[in-house]
UniProtKB/Swiss-Prot annotation:
One of its GO terms (cellular component) is plasma membrane. This is Tetraacyldisaccharide 4'-kinase. The gene is lpxK. The keyword Kinase applies. One of its GO terms (biological process) is lipid A biosynthetic process. ATP binds at T58, V59, G60, G61, S62, G63, K64, T65.
Length: 325
């Protein structure tokens, strides 16, 4: 995924205006595609367990990964048996569906999938075909709820609940691709079950070479650091470090970028701080300057109350249907 154009987040721009006819055409195609599923002309895969879709209507950077980590672990803590399916974006494996393990190679299954697997206590499967991923998951694991990571636009996968995440940039200029950042018209938010704002809380900063070595957040004050981010919204990461007091030298890379050691050949000895998703792909580098900035999702209490009330009822209903009650 390439860096988002600046004009996507400007109310008025010449380029946005020039591209607006293409956005109108894109919207028509999106509506037709969704309509074909709605009237049954395109097949929707349905399953006997609850399916919860987590996604967004904008391109990249809405905090899906930390949120899915929180959701999977919270479901497990409440006594449910969750599983996660994802596309495995950036992975180049020849065989799909594929179960992700802590030892999976990010080059094969994708960086987000490996990060998720390291931080959740439940099974995960990646496949471009989300329906095939769910089938594989249910065939090999006893799950009663499946989380579809970044699956809002994958209408071939049936769903019981939809959660749309919004980052600090909201909907940008409000236009669909290519004139704006929207994958679907903003009216799509009226059809999801929940809209949750992105909010991330700093957790810790640790050295990749020796994770026991950590940096206290107070040590960042007035410290000059190289901030490296190959994510959908690198600006959010840079701003977090600046808020903690660091003097940030920003190095944005394209989303899902795979690093080489020469990418860190800076002309000084300042610390290099990476996002968790980037750090997953840099553990092989023998460089004491590399540190990882980990974060946790902050989830509104009202959402938690409403969501778990709904999902509990859905899981119980589907369980009764499976048992013929």
């Amino acid at each position: 995924m390439l860096k988002a154009p600046r004009f996507w987040y400007q109310p008025r721009s010449l380029l946005g205006g020039i591209l607006s006819p293409f956005s109108f055409l894109y919207q028509i195609i999106v509506r037709i595609r969704r309509g074909l599923y709605a009237v049954g002309l395109k097949k929707i895969s349905k399953f006997p367990v609850s399916i919860v879709i987590v996604g967004n209507i904008t391109v990249g950077g809405s905090g899906k990964t930390p949120f899915v980590i929180w959701l999977a672990n919270e479901l497990k803590n409440r006594g449910f048996r969750p599983g996660v399916v994802s596309r495995g974006y950036g992975g180049k494996a020849n065989r799909f569906p594929q179960t992700v393990t802590e030892n999976s190679d990010p080059l094969q299954v994708g960086d987000e999938a490996v990060l998720l697997m390291k931080k959740i206590d439940c099974p995960m499967v990646v496949c471009r075909d989300r329906g095939a991923a769910v089938k594989h998951l249910l065939r090999n694991f006893q799950c009663d709820v499946v989380i579809g990571d970044d699956g809002l636009q994958h209408y071939s996968l049936g769903r019981d609940l939809e959660i749309a995440l919004l980052d600090d940039r909201h909907l940008g200029n409000g236009r669909c691709l290519p004139a704006g950042p929207l994958r679907e018209p903003k009216s799509r938010l009226n059809t999801v079950d929940f809209v949750v704002p992105k909010q991330l809380r700093p957790n810790e900063i640790y050295q990749l070479k020796n994770p026991a070595k950590k940096i206290d957040f107070n040590e960042l004050k007035e410290l000059t650091v190289h901030a490296v981010a190959g994510i959908g919204n690198p600006g959010y990461f840079f701003k977090q470090l600046e808020t903690l007091g660091a003097n940030v030298i920003a190095h944005p890379f394209r989303d899902h970028y795979f690093y080489r050691s020469e990418d860190f050949n800076f002309d000084d000895d300042h610390l290099i701080i990476l996002t968790e998703k980037d750090a997953i792909k840099c553990k092989q580098f023998d460089d004491e300057r590399l540190f990882c900035f980990s974060v946790d999702a902050v989830v509104p209490d009202q959402f938690q109350n409403d969501f778990f009330r709904l999902i509990s009822n859905i899981i119980l209903r589907k369980q009764a249907q499976r048992e013929g009650i």
